[in-house]
């Protein structure tokens, strides 16, 4: 039993609220326990220079945190004049994850810009961002279909993500901040609804981990992501 009462294989309470931002083509507030992220999807009728004239689209992402999303204030990266390495890594991960499930040839020469803004951080902000951004992306693309700008939804399948780790020698799912800070191993899994992996990130913070521990974490992640797909599907069906 974990300190918050969850079992080793239990997600935190996950909620996804659609149409959270008035002006965005797609938007959600995604909550994994006390981690809260606003994800928006904006449609632009242009593509990066390397795609111009090729008749294909693009999906990319930006990620940021409010200065007081964490226990102590962090200066805005805009004030520093550059994007930090962690931020750059996370926003590239979000973009890759979403591009993995979009048929760019059906999107036409359009870009979908995903913005993930963490308003409260308690572990798992990148995995929550991916899971919520998928729903915002679906809403933005469905809007293009409804307006007749796309003939069909260019989504191949769903994508979601979750964290796992080894805490106190035990494999656990969906780590919060306290667990993440104490974890001997920290991993993130990104998967599609056809049970394929988009990305697996893992680091031993203390002792190296065994194949058996890796298998235990993978099993927890696969089961947890299946639950996230069900949540996404239920939210999109409303």
From Swiss-Prot:
<dbReference type="GO" id="GO:0008033">
    <property type="term" value="P:tRNA processing"/>
</dbReference>
<comment type="function">
    <text>Phosphorolytic 3'-5' exoribonuclease that plays an important role in tRNA 3'-end maturation. Removes nucleotide residues following the 3'-CCA terminus of tRNAs; can also add nucleotides to the ends of RNA molecules by using nucleoside diphosphates as substrates, but this may not be physiologically important. Probably plays a role in initiation of 16S rRNA degradation (leading to ribosome degradation) during starvation.</text>
</comment>
<dbReference type="GO" id="GO:0006364">
    <property type="term" value="P:rRNA processing"/>
</dbReference>
<dbReference type="InterPro" id="IPR020568">
    <property type="entry name" value="Ribosomal_Su5_D2-typ_SF"/>
</dbReference>
<dbReference type="GO" id="GO:0000175">
    <property type="term" value="F:3'-5'-RNA exonuclease activity"/>
</dbReference>
<comment type="similarity">
    <text>Belongs to the RNase PH family.</text>
</comment>
<dbReference type="GO" id="GO:0009022">
    <property type="term" value="F:tRNA nucleotidyltransferase activity"/>
</dbReference>
<keyword id="KW-0819">tRNA processing</keyword>
<keyword id="KW-0820">tRNA-binding</keyword>
<dbReference type="InterPro" id="IPR018336">
    <property type="entry name" value="RNase_PH_CS"/>
</dbReference>
<dbReference type="Pfam" id="PF01138">
    <property type="entry name" value="RNase_PH"/>
</dbReference>
<keyword id="KW-0698">rRNA processing</keyword>
<keyword id="KW-0548">Nucleotidyltransferase</keyword>
<dbReference type="InterPro" id="IPR050080">
    <property type="entry name" value="RNase_PH"/>
</dbReference>
<dbReference type="InterPro" id="IPR002381">
    <property type="entry name" value="RNase_PH_bac-type"/>
</dbReference>
<protein>
    <recommendedName>
        <fullName>Ribonuclease PH</fullName>
        <ecNumber>2.7.7.56</ecNumber>
    </recommendedName>
</protein>
<dbReference type="InterPro" id="IPR036345">
    <property type="entry name" value="ExoRNase_PH_dom2_sf"/>
</dbReference>
<dbReference type="GO" id="GO:0016075">
    <property type="term" value="P:rRNA catabolic process"/>
</dbReference>
<dbReference type="Pfam" id="PF03725">
    <property type="entry name" value="RNase_PH_C"/>
</dbReference>
<feature type="binding site">
    <location>
        <begin position="124"/>
        <end position="126"/>
    </location>
    <ligand>
        <name>phosphate</name>
    </ligand>
</feature>
<keyword id="KW-0694">RNA-binding</keyword>
<feature type="binding site">
    <location>
        <position position="86"/>
    </location>
    <ligand>
        <name>phosphate</name>
    </ligand>
</feature>
<dbReference type="InterPro" id="IPR001247">
    <property type="entry name" value="ExoRNase_PH_dom1"/>
</dbReference>
<dbReference type="InterPro" id="IPR015847">
    <property type="entry name" value="ExoRNase_PH_dom2"/>
</dbReference>
<comment type="subunit">
    <text>Homohexameric ring arranged as a trimer of dimers.</text>
</comment>
<dbReference type="InterPro" id="IPR027408">
    <property type="entry name" value="PNPase/RNase_PH_dom_sf"/>
</dbReference>
<dbReference type="GO" id="GO:0000049">
    <property type="term" value="F:tRNA binding"/>
</dbReference>
<keyword id="KW-0808">Transferase</keyword>
